[in-house]
Amino acid sequence: MTETIYHLPVPATVALLADLHDRPYFSIIQSLSDRRPATICIAGDVVFGDPPKDGNLLIQTQKYVLPFLRACCALAPTFLSLGNHEKAVCGEDLQRIRDTGCVLLDNSWTTYNGMVLGGLTSHFVLDFRRLREKKHERYPDRGSEPRVIKEPETGWLEEFERQAGYRILLCHHPEYYPRYLKRRDIDLVLSGHAHGGQWRIGSQGIFAPSQGLFPRLTDGVHDGRLVISRGLSNRAPVPRLNNPPEIVYVQN
């Protein structure tokens, strides 16, 4: 795992984590313990896997997620937004996440120490919620039913933009930025999802979900305010190549 530091005009050091996918986390916590950021921002995809069929909660099938969140919260205030892999989590799962002390930002915002932190929820999550409400099941099976919701819910961002303070938006999907966020008054957008392009040739990623071949938004700083993490693990059938997992620190 690599540590990457970007210097931007943030009021305090922010750690950006993304795409844990329920993997071991000791080296991540060691880095956070050494660096001591003021806040820890997790831009989605902490969970991995399909809902259980035995009546248990999805979060109960995750070996590392809750201990990881507790360990983060013991080091610094921790904020979490929802990525595409959180699509199946139900209300009970989300409550277990909140019980760790983590602040869940689900198309919502909060304030902390002069900062305004928001979380833009993945449209995959919204579509599964629609299915859940329709079928009145904790973990509905999509089956052959087509996906209906294909865009994030952005109406609440108008209020978020008006808040006084340094505005940080956790947004799992970097591809949302050009269409939904570029023209908004937001100081910092923190993303993941692209896994650095999975294989990298020099600075170019080869493939990213939602962007396809030779994606543009896989890591680094874009437009002076979009920061993308290459992610903390790999659950894809294709291994990473020239693309180590990454924890990002944004500091002044």
Please identify what each model-predicted range represents:
Residues 1-15, 20-21:
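Acidic, histidine-bearing metal-coordination/catalytic regions of metal-dependent phosphoesterases
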Residues 4-9, 107-113, 218-223:
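Short acidic-hydrophobic surface loop/beta-edge motif
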Residues 14-26, 46-61, 88, 125-143, ...:
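Acidic/histidine-rich helix-loop elements
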Residues 16-18, 39-45, 77-84, 105-107, ...:
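Active-site neighborhood of phospho(di)ester-bond hydrolases with catalytic His/Asp-centered motifs
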Residues 25-113:
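Core catalytic region of metal-dependent phosphoesterases/phosphodiesterases
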Residues 46-49, 84-88, 110, 123-125, ...:
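Solvent-exposed loop/turn segments at secondary-structure junctions
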Residues 79, 174-249:
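Conserved beta-sheet core of the metallophosphoesterase superfamily
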Residues 100, 113-171, 177-179, 237-241, ...:
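Binuclear metal-dependent hydrolase catalytic cores centered on His/Asp/Glu-rich metal-binding motifs
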